């Protein structure tokens, strides 16, 4: 996959017929895309050819749709390709799509597309055995009347399996425009002596600017949280302006994460800033407007146009409890007033900046529908739907895919996974227990290793890339730079606290860049 650029508007035209690059005009035809043509299970399905361990590829009953599917399985180790070449194509970009699933053992199953300029590949993500996922891969054809080869590949240990169904080849390019990292803890880390190093595989472990390291590995955006009056003097508007300037110098776009609190805000805690504690609803509305405008203008003063601003953080339960809560008691009209004030402030500061509304539990479609049905009924404007998705808390990829696809279709808004992470180890590097530190918390197929961390992020990006009509923007890896630095703990009122997150950062316990960072290069 090709690297895209996150500049100007945070939303670049994406994929599938509306790509920023010219889409091919030809409508390709895949023969026997659902493996139904033979009417029974066969060794070699009509329209497809095999190579490698040919006995490991066959069709059988149990399709994602229809009756049959392509399956790869063998009692011994195997490597097999089942492919089809589509000819007579015009020059341009093409995207292959397939529904797939695989076992969780040693099993490199993938969808490949070769249009003559090299093989592009998307791996089949790990999911429960009964869960099909749709994945996509794009490649460019550089000559008229050319051809593209769709390849369904498996290299696996004996007994491991993969299934494929409903193959498509369509004109256009499915490329993510946001490959981001939350670096909210970075400034405080640096102030307390934190250092960051390139990975030893390619850069000899040189000490460098963390933002430059991220950008060199393919990241094109950062996310910065903003508290109103934090106890430790970090994560405030002044720091936002400084980090925004540094991000611009490093070639990174900026997403502003407004918490509307003096400390952490999430579904369970949406505490008003102390200075706003006794405000009326009218005063809170004005305070939201003023704070949002001030945050945005602080960046503009540094020559930075924020690509996106999110109004609140994980606001399933609302903001500014209890006045803006969605339950106990529900105050949807008040919440709508606050969000409308924030939206107005962003657009006054920068009309092209996108406004995001962000919920937790990215695979919970019922909650997302309930929340956005209520907020749209109140007439709240917004541009992007953001979702937190941590696989160990929020479940497998299937519900995430269903929810992202549904949000894009139901509300006509682009979607982004705005928080995600996974551990590279179960060890710890300070005196604070880690948020994820037990083997029982891990997901089968994603070990707590550098490779498991990278595979987890890769597969989440694949799900966002597959959102139809280019409506999936990308993802931000949460607090990628939060290594264990004394003084940079989770509690802004307690300098002795640890961070509980160092085993999920994008830098290891020696502050070296981890392989997960390479997933920024699609």
Predicted regions and their residues:
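Extracellular carbohydrate-recognition regions
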Residues: 25-50, 173-183
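Aromatic-lined substrate-binding rim segments of carbohydrate-active enzymes
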Residues: 206-265, 273, 329-352, 400-410
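Extra-cytoplasmic beta-strand recognition segments
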Residues: 35, 80-107, 135-139, 167, ...
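Extracellular carbohydrate recognition and processing domains
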Residues: 116-146
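Extracellular glycan-recognition surfaces and repeat-rich motifs
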Residues: 36-76, 209
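Active-site cleft segment of glycoside hydrolase catalytic domains centered on the general acid/base Glu
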Residues: 236-239, 266-382, 395-404, 490-499, ...
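Aromatic-rich peripheral "rim/lid" segments of glycoside hydrolase catalytic domains that contact
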Residues: 191-192, 406, 425-459, 463, ...
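Glycoside hydrolase catalytic-domain groove-lining segments
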Residues: 354, 365-443, 451-452, 458-466, ...
């Amino acid at each position: 996959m090709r690297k895209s650029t996150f500049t100007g508007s945070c939303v670049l035209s994406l994929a599938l017929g509306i790509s920023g690059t010219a889409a091919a005009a030809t409508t390709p035809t895949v023969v026997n895309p659902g493996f139904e043509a033979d009417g029974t299970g066969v060794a070699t399905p009509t329209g497809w050819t095999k190579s490698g361990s040919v006995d490991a590829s066959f069709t059988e009953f149990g399709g994602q749709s229809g009756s049959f599917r392509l399956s790869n399985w063998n009692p011994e180790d195997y490597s097999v390709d089942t492919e089809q070449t589509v000819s007579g194509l015009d020059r341009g970009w093409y995207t292959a799509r397939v529904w797939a699933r695989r076992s969780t053992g040693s099993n490199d199953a993938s969808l490949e597309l070769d249009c003559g300029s090299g093989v592009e590949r998307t791996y089949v993500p790990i999911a429960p055995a009964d869960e099909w996922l749709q994945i996509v891969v794009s490649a460019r054809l550089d000559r008229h009347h050319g051809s593209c080869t769709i390849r369904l590949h498996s290299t696996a240990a004996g007994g491991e399996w993969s299934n494929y169904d409903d193959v498509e080849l369509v004109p256009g390019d499915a490329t993510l425009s946001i490959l981001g990292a939350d670096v909210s803890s970075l400034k405080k880390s640096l102030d307390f002596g934190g250092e960051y190093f390139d990975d030893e595989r390619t850069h000899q472990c040189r000490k460098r600017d963390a933002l430059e390291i991220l950008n060199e590995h393919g990241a094109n955006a950062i996310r910065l949280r903003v508290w109103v009056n934090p106890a430790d003097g970090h994560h405030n508007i002044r720091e936002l302006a400084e980090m925004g300037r540094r991000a611009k110098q490093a070639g990174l776009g900026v997403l502003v994460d407004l918490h509307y609190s003096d400390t952490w805000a999430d579904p369970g805690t949406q505490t008003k800033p102390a200075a706003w504690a006794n405000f009326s609803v009218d005063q809170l509305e004005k305070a939201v407007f003023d704070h949002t405008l001030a945050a945005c203008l602080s960046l503009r003063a540094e020559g930075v146009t924020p690509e996106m601003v999110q109004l609140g953080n994980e606001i399933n339960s609302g903001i500014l409890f209890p006045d803006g809560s969605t339950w106990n008691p529900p105050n949807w009209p008040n919440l709508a007033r606050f969000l409308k004030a924030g939206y107005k402030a962003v657009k006054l500061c920068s009309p092209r900046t996108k406004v995001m509304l962000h919920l937790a539990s990215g695979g919970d479609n019922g909650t997302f529908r309930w929340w956005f049905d209520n907020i749209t009924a109140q007439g709240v404007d917004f541009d992007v739907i953001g979702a937190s998705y941590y696989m160990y808390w929020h479940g497998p990829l299937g519900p995430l895919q269903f929810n992202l696809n549904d949000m894009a279709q139901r509300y006509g808004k682009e979607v982004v996974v705005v928080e995600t992470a996974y551990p590279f180890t179960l060890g710890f590097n300070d005196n604070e227990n880690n948020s994820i530190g037990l083997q029982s918390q891990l997901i089968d197929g994603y070990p707590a290793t550098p490779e498991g961390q990278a595979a987890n992020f890769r597969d989440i990006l694949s799900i966002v890339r597959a959102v139809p009509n280019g409506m999936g923007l990308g993802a931000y890896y949460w607090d990628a730079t939060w290594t264990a630095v004394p003084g940079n703990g989770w509690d802004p009122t307690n300098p002795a606290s640890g961070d509980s997150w160092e085993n999920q950062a994008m830098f290891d316990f020696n502050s070296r860049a981890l392989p997960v960072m390479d997933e920024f290069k699609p």
